[in-house]
Amino acid sequence: MATTWQGVNNAITDIVEGPISPRVNEPIGPGRMHIKVDEIVARKGPAPWIELCIEDERNLGTLIASAPGQGNRAHWHSNFDEWWVVMGGKLRWELTGGKIIHAVKGDIVWIPRGTVHHIVTEGDEMSLRFAVAMPPAVHVWQDECENCDVTWEPEKPA
């Protein structure tokens, strides 16, 4: 009897047959097997900043720091779900249909593909979140957030 998980495995071409030694362990950049978040925060300093921590053919892991009141542009993804681990501060996710999620350190937020989302740091301290996505992580940008009064200039063709 096949499961949906077997179907997923059949779609992945890079499957190993048994235990192997780690294939990557870069000293810097994506490919590090052990990432010390405190060291990144100390090196990067005050928000805003991002640090790409994990990148391979199936995974993108990005550490994101935002200043109080700061947010990203509303967007959605057509081919992957996105999720975050809140590591510091308070964040607000504003979603399609008027749904709002408030999250704090220790929370995990998962947003299904197709859902417009816009993330804002609440309170008076920097927020820190670890975002997990699937490459190439294409963003479909929106000109406004339907839940708040934030608007952005329309994207100009490159």
Labelled PLM ranges:
Residues 92, 105, 113-140:
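Ligand-binding loop in jelly-roll beta-barrel domains
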Residues 64-67, 76-93, 133-135:
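Short, conserved beta-strand element in jelly-roll/cupin
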Residues 51-55, 63-64, 72-78, 95, ...:
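Short histidine-centered beta-strand/loop micro-motifs
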Residues 68-70, 79, 99, 115-116, ...:
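A generic "binding-loop/recognition-motif" signal
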Residues 57-59, 80, 126:
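Short acidic/glycine-enriched loop/turn segments that link adjacent beta-strands
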Residues 97-113:
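Short acidic-glycine-tyrosine-enriched beta hairpin
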Residues 64, 83, 106-107, 117-119:
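Hydrophobic/aromatic beta-strand elements that line small-molecule binding cavities or substrate pockets
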Residues 1-60, 73-74, 144-158:
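A short, N-terminal "cap"/entry segment at the start of jelly-roll beta-barrel domains
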